[in-house]
């Protein structure tokens, strides 16, 4: 009975709008359809869909660097399905002009950041793509966490767009602060043999913090099959100076 009810419900679900988007292809069309969302299945959602369509198309194109599109919307209120036709001319794109990327603090001398900033995913002259800028921003923060710059933060992040000129200036400054070191290693299991545990360590107190080493220690402990649960976590709130304690829960 439950299966029959589910099948009946699925069969009864029907859209109330027929949508057509023409004039654009590829990533532009894919992004527009993603911003528009699912075709509505109720009259109320249908009205909201139509009212917000232009703004969503504009936002979808701006995310890809197209700030002066021509959008024609035609709505036919036929029943049971309205017909919404959206014709789009994306127009000329905004292109990246100036790129100002700075790594400040101890990470300025870190080869890992040098490699990251040598290939940021876009160049001067490229069409502005907000997704690529955001992707690079996340990579900077992620690398900082992995390499031990746990107090690092982005202190400046902006895109200045001149629509009439068709240009965009990009700025991102990351202040890493100091690179922290491993502090005391705290084990909450008093039954484990200390020599056995020490033989599996992938770092020592005083070594530079590295997320990969934490993961390696956790993997080693898990592979012993001695413990039902293994959790290795940095104790950020208990850090003193440049040392961060590591808690090993077994």
Language-model regions: role of each:
Residues 13-27, 33-250:
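Periplasmic polypeptide-binding modules associated with outer-membrane biogenesis and secretion
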Residues 1-4:
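Sec-dependent signal peptide recognition
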Residues 7-10:
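N-terminal signal peptide c-region/cleavage motif recognized by signal peptidases
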């Amino acid at each position: 009975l439950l299966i029959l009810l589910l099948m009946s419900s699925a069969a009864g679900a029907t859209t109330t709008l027929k949508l057509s988007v023409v004039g654009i292809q590829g990533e532009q069309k894919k992004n527009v359809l993603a911003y528009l969302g699912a075709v509505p299945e109720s009259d109320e959602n249908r009205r909201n869909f139509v009212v917000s369509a232009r703004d969503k198309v504009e936002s979808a194109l701006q995310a890809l660097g197209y700030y002066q599109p021509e959008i024609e919307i035609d709505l036919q209120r036929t029943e049971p399905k309205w017909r919404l036709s959206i014709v789009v001319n994306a127009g000329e794109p905004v292109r990246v002009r100036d790129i100002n990327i700075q790594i400040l603090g101890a990470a300025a001398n870190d080869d890992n950041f040098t490699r990251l900033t040598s290939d940021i995913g876009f160049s001067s002259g490229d069409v502005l793509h907000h997704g690529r800028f955001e992707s690079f921003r996340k990579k900077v923060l992620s690398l900082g966490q992995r390499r031990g710059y746990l107090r690092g933060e982005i202190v400046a992040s902006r895109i200045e767009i001149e629509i009439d000129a068709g240009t965009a200036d990009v700025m991102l400054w990351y202040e890493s602060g100091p690179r922290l070191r491993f502090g005391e290693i705290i084990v909450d299991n008093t039954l484990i043999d200390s020599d056995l545990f020490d033989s599996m360590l992938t770092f020592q107190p005083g070594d530079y913090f590295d997320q990969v080493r934490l993961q390696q220690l956790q993997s080693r402990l898990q592979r012993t099959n001695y413990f039902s649960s293994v959790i290795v976590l940095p104790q950020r709130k208990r850090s003193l100076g440049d040392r961060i304690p590591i808690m090993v829960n077994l």
